[in-house]
Regions:
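Short beta-strand/loop motif that positions the catalytic acidic residue
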Residues: 187, 193-195
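Short beta-to-alpha linker loops that shape the active-site pocket of alpha/beta-hydrolase fold enzymes
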Residues: 57-61, 127, 222-224
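Conserved alpha/beta-hydrolase "acid-adjacent" motif
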Residues: 199-205
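Catalytic active-site module of serine/aspartate enzymes centered on a nucleophile-bearing elbow/loop
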Residues: 216-249
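Hydrophobic, aromatic-rich cap/lid helix
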Residues: 154-180, 187
Length: 249
């Protein structure tokens, strides 16, 4: 089982396929692991014929194998560190990204941290702020992720979880938590957005990102309602990501 280690962070990852590198970020919120990629579709299976697909368990997902400190002062950047560090470990300089749910905000922050490295990104059912449920992510994670992490890790307390979630969500309300609207207006990477509309995946916020970004595409909506629609979105993602592979790759 492959692990990448960087100081106190240990990341479990897998890769499959061949071609231009594609970083695959699971949904499942802070509990996201490789197993979370099973639905609505698994890029590790569906895109492996066109890309070298690389995915990892999220740091501190209770059921996963990736561990590290809770960096409450820089929650989103700590995940970007993990993603970029893994690419460095594998000797990959430039890559595409596809991700689900919480990975939408993570992708935008990844582009902010390494604009020269991300050639294109597909944000599937991205999460974002919903004004009628302003504390949704804090409350859900205090109820589920936090206690499960504390049970798995004797060095983590609910006070630490509270500080992390407050910094990650409560102090960053109003948009997508990880970046502001000005960044999206100048986002250097092409974006593909597949909107959803459940409490944690607000349609309005996904479409605002698409409207603000200077180079964006939007898939059909709804798309998770039938296998045929899922297939259509998978093919859209494949075309989009392939279209932005550098010619000298």
């Amino acid at each position: 089982m492959p692990f990448y280690e960087n100081r106190s962070v240990r990341t479990y990852y897998e890769e499959t396929g061949s071609g231009f590198p594609l970083l695959v970020l699971p949904g499942g919120g802070l509990s996201g692991t490789l197993a979370s990629l099973a639905t609505p579709f698994n890029p590790m299976e569906r895109l492996k014929d066109d890309f070298r697909c690389i995915a990892a368990d999220r740091r501190n997902a209770p059921s996963g194998q990736s561990t590290g400190p809770l960096e409450s002062g820089r929650p989103w950047d700590s995940f970007a560190d993990d993603h970029l560090g893994l690419m460095d470990h594998l000797g990959i300089q430039r890559f595409g990204v596809i991700g689900f749910c919480i990975s939408g905000p993570m992708i935008l922050n990844l582009i902010k941290n390494a604009p020269e490295r991300v050639v294109a990104a597909a944000m599937m059912q991205p999460s974002g702020y919903r004004p009628e449920l302003p504390d949704l992510f804090y409350q859900n994670n205090m109820k589920e992720w936090g206690p499960a992490l504390c049970e798995a890790r004797a060095d983590v307390t609910m006070e630490m979880v509270d500080a992390f979630l407050t910094s990650m969500y409560t102090d960053r309300t109003g948009f997508v938590f990880s970046v502001d609207r000005d960044f999206v207006r100048s986002c250097p990477a092409p974006l593909l957005i597949a909107p959803d509309d459940v409490p944690s995946h607000p349609y309005k916020m996904a479409m605002e990102v698409a409207d603000l970004a200077p180079d964006s595409e939007v898939t059909i909506y709804p798309w998770k309602d039938t296998p045929e629609h899922i297939d259509e979105v998978v093919e859209h993602a494949r075309r989009f990501l392939k279209a932005h592979v550098p010619v000298n790759a």
